[in-house]
Amino acid sequence: AIFRNATALKQTAASMPEAELRRALGIDAGSLEGWFAPDTYHYTSGSADLAVMKQAVAKQKALLAKAWESRSEAARVKTPYEALTLASIIEKETGLATDRHLVSSVFNNRLSIGMPLQTDPTVIYGLGEKFSGNITRKDLQTPTPYNTYVIPALPPTPIAAPTWASIEAAVNPADTRFLYFVSKGDGSSHFSQSLAEHNRAVRQFILNRPKTQKKAKPKEPQPTKETAR
């Protein structure tokens, strides 16, 4: 959509089937999602959109390769593409720089013990246009390839275009035993090792949140073992 809205670009990619576009961009994966590095790209009027896309893909590939080469032993992703996928989840879960490596630690810790990631952004992505804007228990139970409350692994593709900060965090998680986190309502998160501690945090930061704040945020599930994250 970003490229289509750039009216100064010569539109060449819009009419291409996605598989053909992936080949043209040198993307071996089965999806374009996640491969365009978020950045500012300079071009002249009349430039082909495909040329700018290639710049974005080349940058993302370079960033991913750089991160993969410096990954820590604590990283539980098995391939660069899995790292890109996890990075996209981190990107959607937090915009706070100080929380990225902590969020990464939660997901890497869960992957290491075969625990479902149970992350809402993947559910929302899987629902697509069916998502109402307020996540519900039914949404969490609706099976899609991206519902990480249902599947015990990473989703099949990224769900967003991650920045360098999220890519680096995905392969260099903080050294913690955290398995849960919950939004505190101010952009930061509270992290917990146990379900009991997490449920207390949910009561503190979600259930006791003023109604005006609750309306401003997507509804979060009640703290049960199946839906806690």
Question: Predicted regions: what is each one?
Answer:
Residues 97-150:
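Small-residue-rich helix-loop
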Residues 145-154, 163-164, 183:
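Short, local alpha-helical segments
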